[in-house]
């Protein structure tokens, strides 16, 4: 007899865990560059869609098809008898719940190998993870395998999901090598910030929300007082550990870097969630507090270690979040377990080293298995399909070469975070933001004018000039209106990247100084003959002025010759009847 309450609760948990795919997609896309956004989204979609039939094919059978020490059984398409699981929910409900967990393990790998992985290779190794890697590890810990028989405890997947995915992420990033430009010739890291911190933050919020289904749903039951109490404790511990880890990461980066690091703090939230996942059912809130506290520091130190010492390029911090804190969360069970739901209490609760030893043994064996199998798979893929894309593909971006996608943001001007528009600050403020009150000196400082000397000898003087205006994107409409009011009827407009003497806004990304920042600008070019050049210059200066250095720059050139291609007309005549 099935329990409708437990069935509904398990399905809700499964749906929430599925929605974690959206969180991972946004998080990874935001923490990488815009030219690879489509590729990131495609990978997060396909690892789930590839993993689902693979897990149905043999994965679930290997994981739960029997109680053997090493594997469950070979049950293609899940047709066997699973009564030994003792479920009070329909088998297919349980299969759905386990399928979305399997997909999560594969998704973790995407982030660390982002921006340089061959898409074909990604599809192949995602299938391998869902077919043989995750199911066998899962059987050892959850399916009646040898680790579960020894008393190894991993309630919702710090080891089975996050550590497994994190180990593969570490191995893959190491075998791929760093992105072009990540390290200089001396091995010093260069920061490569993501292009959309807003998307990254939204992804973290989605993941945090879905984690209540990831951990809470793992109880598989809400039908008794005991299971309702357990689920409540699981959800509370999950939230507490994540919140504490976030606060600790913020404070730690504030002390370490001089300012609280946003991207690192977001990763701190995920680190706390990963770390509490193994023991959320067996630790007290005090234990959850300390687990989150350590996770908040560990994620920062881990990012710095892999970035600066190990030289493993992990664009989104997946290794530090999932591997480092998956290991920590699994070990923490052996330290903080109160003895409920585990074979032994943790070291700090009088249980001695028994539970801790089992947790450590399980981690070592699982990681060795994963590394050996995935190293072989990666090597085979590298020798056949190629694991990494060519340099020119990486430089141009995977979107255009791998998917024929010019931009994931059609219709929008999107630049990477290291190309973000510079905001006014005290170093550029000229003391007057009203153009009508600004002095000539302030106007010239905000929008300097560079005039090319007019050459008479040997140069035909047409009486025409080209005025080239470099301005902020936000000021284009005002500039266009000012030029139209003046009578300028033709202009050429292009988007450009560059920086002036300010060299962009100085910043750090995950503790690494960001190189010279290129800022998105608009370049407007007009050719004038009858209209006074000085009138054009003054109109542009008034339209662009905000009272800060960097408002824009104007270049004035002498035009020696203009030719209209269609008619052959030259100079002033060539400018008439503009097509």
Where are these regions (language model features)?
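Glycine- and aromatic-enriched membrane alpha-helices
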Residues: 1-456
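Positively charged, small/polar-rich N-terminal and surface patches that mediate targeting and assembly
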Residues: 401-405, 420-579
């Amino acid at each position: 007899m099935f329990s409708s309450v437990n069935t509904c609760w398990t399905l809700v948990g499964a749906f929430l865990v599925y929605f974690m795919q959206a969180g991972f997609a946004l998080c990874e896309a935001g923490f990488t560059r815009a030219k690879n956004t489509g590729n990131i989204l495609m990978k997060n979609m396909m690892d789930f869609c590839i993993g689902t039939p693979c897990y149905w094919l043999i994965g679930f059978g290997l994981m739960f098809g029997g109680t053997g020490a090493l594997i469950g059984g070979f049950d293609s398409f899940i047709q066997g008898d699973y009564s030994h699981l003792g479920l009070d929910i329909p088998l297919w409900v349980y299969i759905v719940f386990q399928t979305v967990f399997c997909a999560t393990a594969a998704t973790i790998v995407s982030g660390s190998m982002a921006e340089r992985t061959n898409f074909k290779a990604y599809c192949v190794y995602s299938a391998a993870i869902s077919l043989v890697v995750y199911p066998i590890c899962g059987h050892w810990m959850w399916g009646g395998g040898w680790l579960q028989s020894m008393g190894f405890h991993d309630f919702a997947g710090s080891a089975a999901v996050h550590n497994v995915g994190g180990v593969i992420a570490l191995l893959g990033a190491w075998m791929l090598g760093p992105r072009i430009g990540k390290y200089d010739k001396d091995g010093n890291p260069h920061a490569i910030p993501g292009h959309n911190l807003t998307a990254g933050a939204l992804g973290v919020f989605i993941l945090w929300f879905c984690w209540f289904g990831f951990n809470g749903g793992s109880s598989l039951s809400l039908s008794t007082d005991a299971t309702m109490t357990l689920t409540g404790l699981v959800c509370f511990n999950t939230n507490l550990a994540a919140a504490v880890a976030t606060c600790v990461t913020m404070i730690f980066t504030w002390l370490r870097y001089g300012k609280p690091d946003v991207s690192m703090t977001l990763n701190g939230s995920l680190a706390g969630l990963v770390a509490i996942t193994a023991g959320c059912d067996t630790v007290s809130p005090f234990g959850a507090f300390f687990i989150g506290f350590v996770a908040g520091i560990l994620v920062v130190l881990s990012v710095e270690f892999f970035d600066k010492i190990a030289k493993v390029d992990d664009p989104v911090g997946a290794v530090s979040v999932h591997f480092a804190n998956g290991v920590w969360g699994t070990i923490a069970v052996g330290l903080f377990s109160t003895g409920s739901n585990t074979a032994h209490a943790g070291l700090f609760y009088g249980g001695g080293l028994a539970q801790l030893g089992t947790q450590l043994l399980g981690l070592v064996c699982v990681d060795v298995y994963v590394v050996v199998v995935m190293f072989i798979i990666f090597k085979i893929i590298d020798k056949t399909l190629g694991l990494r894309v060519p340099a020119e593909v990486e430089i141009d971006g995977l979107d255009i070469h791998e998917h024929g996608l010019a931009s994931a943001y059609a219709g929008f001007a999107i630049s990477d975070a290291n190309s973000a528009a510079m905001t006014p600050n005290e170093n550029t403020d000229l003391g007057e933001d009203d153009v009508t009150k600004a002095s000539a000196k302030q106007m010239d400082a905000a929008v300097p004018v560079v005039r090319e000397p007019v050459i008479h000898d040997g140069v035909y003087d047409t009486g025409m000039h080209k005025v080239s205006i470099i301005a902020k994107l936000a000021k284009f409409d005002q500039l266009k209106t000012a030029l139209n009011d003046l009578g300028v009827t033709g202009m050429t407009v292009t988007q450009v990247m560059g920086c002036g003497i300010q060299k962009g806004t100085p910043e750090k990304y995950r503790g690494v100084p960001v190189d010279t920042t290129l800022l998105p600008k608009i370049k407007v070019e007009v050719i004038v003959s009858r209209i006074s050049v000085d009138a054009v210059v003054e109109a542009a200066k008034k339209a662009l002025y905000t009272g800060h250095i960097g408002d824009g720059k104007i270049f004035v050139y002498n035009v020696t010759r203009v030719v209209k291609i269609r008619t052959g007309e030259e100079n002033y005549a060539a400018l008439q009847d503009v097509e």
